[in-house]
Amino acid sequence: MGQKINPNGFRLGITTDHVSHWYADSNQPGQRYKDYIREDVKIRELMSKGMDRAGISKVEIERTRDRVRVDIHTARPGIVIGRRGAEADRIRGELEKLTGKQIQLNILEVKNPEIDAQLVAQGVAEQLASRVAFRRAMKKAIQSAQRAGAKGIRIQCAGRLGGAEMSRSEFYREGRVPLHTLRANIDYGFFEAKTTFGRIGVKVWIYKGDLTDKELAAQQAAAPSSRGRNDRRGGGGGERRRRPNDRNDRGGRRERDSAAAPQQNSAAEANNAEGGK
């Protein structure tokens, strides 16, 4: 299952979080759950149009009663902001027109774009659209990710690779990419390259390491703790009652048996002596 499912959805609540934060319990038109979902899709489509060179990694949306907060994670914040903030003002105006609410626009810079799966997939797709050989583009992205500190990376391209008549898929992998390990921090990205031969899909998995014991302990502390067996029985948590065949008592039993053996032998000799008389 880990080989097929989207890694972000598979690890939701463990290493990943929702990209939309809001709650809908109204039946009024425009405030229903499906309305918010449709609006989120339109917002993300608006961010993707005309922003091919901006390197947008993800868009997070948070809603309140009369305001919508949009966080744009990008590798090139200067392109999104524009000269003197003109581009940011244009985006804010289009979002307010789309949602009809006040927009709080936050533009955040991606510190290490070489190990951001979405940006890596977008970079490989741009090279494929520029007629770069797909194997060369994939290997170059893998080398850049490993130099940036990735513990494992896998890149897959599918489509009419190299202009072939029949479509196929090829992938390259370096390092470990444990897709079944839930505590593994795996970033996933997908992008489509529009070439003269058709569309080529690019998928990227980047393994950044496991959650530390400290992080797991913090999660377990946040979860409701269950009582122990002694608490359920009403005991004070003392030592458990030993049974005759307890393994932990075998050493002491052997010592007691060896100490009692000479006494038994002396008693048997005394009885034999009396019988001989």
Curated annotation (Swiss-Prot):
Q: Where is there biased composition of kind Basic and acidic residues?
A: 245-258
Q: Which GO terms describe its molecular function?
A: mRNA binding; rRNA binding; structural constituent of ribosome
Tell whether RNA-binding is among the UniProt keywords. Answer: yes
All residue ranges annotated as the KH type-2 domain in the record:
43-111
Comp. bias regions, Low complexity? 259-277
The alphabetized UniProt keywords are: Ribonucleoprotein, Ribosomal protein, RNA-binding, rRNA-binding
InterPro entries, per the entry: KH_dom (IPR004087), KH_dom-like_a/b (IPR015946), KH_dom_type_2 (IPR004044), KH_sf_prok-type (IPR009019), Ribosomal_S3_C_sf (IPR036419), Ribosomal_uS3_bac-typ (IPR005704), Ribosomal_uS3_C (IPR001351), Ribosomal_uS3_CS (IPR018280)
**What are the GO BP annotations of this UniProt entry?**
translation
Going by the entry's taxonomy, the superkingdom of the source organism is recorded as: Bacteria
One GO cellular component this record assigns the protein to is: cytosolic small ribosomal subunit
Summary of the function given for this chain in its UniProt record:
Binds the lower part of the 30S subunit head. Binds mRNA in the 70S ribosome, positioning it for translation.
NCBIfam families reported for this sequence: rpsC_bact
Q: What is this protein called?
A: Small ribosomal subunit protein uS3
Species of the source = Kocuria rhizophila (strain ATCC 9341 / DSM 348 / NBRC 103217 / DC2201)
The lineage, from the top, is: Bacteria, Bacillati, Actinomycetota, Actinomycetes, Micrococcales
Q: Which gene encodes it?
A: rpsC
